[in-house]
A protein has these predicted regions:
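A short beta-loop-alpha structural element at the N-terminal edge
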Residues: 8-23
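Short glycine/proline-centered loop/turn elements that form peptide/ligand docking sites
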Residues: 95, 99, 121-125, 142-148
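Conserved acetyl-CoA-binding loop-helix of GNAT-fold acetyltransferases
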Residues: 91-108, 127-131
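Active-site acidic-Proline motif in GNAT/NAT acetyltransferases
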Residues: 86-92, 120-121
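Acetyl-CoA-dependent GNAT
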Residues: 34-89, 99, 105, 160-163, ...
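Short hydrophobic/aromatic beta-strand or adjacent loop that forms the aromatic wall/cage
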Residues: 53, 152-156
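Hydrophobic alpha-helical core bundles mediating ligand binding, dimerization, or RNAP-core interactions
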Residues: 21-29, 47
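Conserved catalytic-core motifs of GNAT/GCN5-like acyltransferases
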Residues: 115-118, 135-153
Length: 174
């Protein structure tokens, strides 16, 4: 899968991307929202082993700026995740466009519902998800522990196609 819109590209992650993915995944500033304030402590070899369908990278003007993923969790239901890892690319609407590209592709390819969760403290992400039409399903208070054993809370979201608000025209697919 390869999707393009303006200067943005979403494509399948490749072995050549593993070094950058490893750097991001080991960066506590990038991974803190996911419960890993010290990073994952993973190796490039482990990242390469984990590359597969649904593991994608985000490029802006041919520069790697983040990653996204999806996985089938039930019949017609995909769970997604996204990280804009390069701080100079955050707060510019890139995530909203990338999510519009990915979600539109998932709906065009047979999915009827998209689900995701985010840390309760990640209000920036919550605003983006809600602007795309996601509906808050549940708040899970003190439901998991981060790397330091601190209790964390999360918010579960879901989106059906009729509620989807895209921020792009249809992207080019290859």
């Amino acid at each position: 899968m390869k999707l393009q819109y303006e200067s943005l590209t979403i494509r399948q992650a490749e072995v050549a991307d593993a070094e950058q993915l490893t750097t991001w995944w080991n960066d506590g500033a990038v991974m803190a929202h996911a419960g890993f304030p010290n990073g994952l402590g993973t190796t490039e070899e482990e990242v390469i082993e984990g590359l597969g369908d649904g593991c994608m990278v985000i490029e802006e003007s041919d520069r790697l700026i983040g990653e996204c993923n999806y996985r089938n969790v039930a019949d017609g239901v995909a769970e997604i995740g996204i990280k804009i890892c390069e701080t100079d690319c955050q707060n510019r609407g890139v995530g909203r466009k990338v999510l519009s590209m990915l979600i539109g592709w998932l709906f065009r390819n047979g999915y009827s519902k998209i689900v995701l969760d985010t840390n309760l403290t990640n209000t920036r992400a919550q605003r983006v998800y809600e602007s795309l039409g996601f509906r808050k399903v549940r708040t899970n208070i003190d439901s998991w522990k981060d790397q330091f054993g601190r209790l964390q809370s999360s918010v579960d979201y879901e989106l059906v196609e009729k509620d989807f608000v895209s921020y792009i025209d249809c992207p080019k697919e290859e």
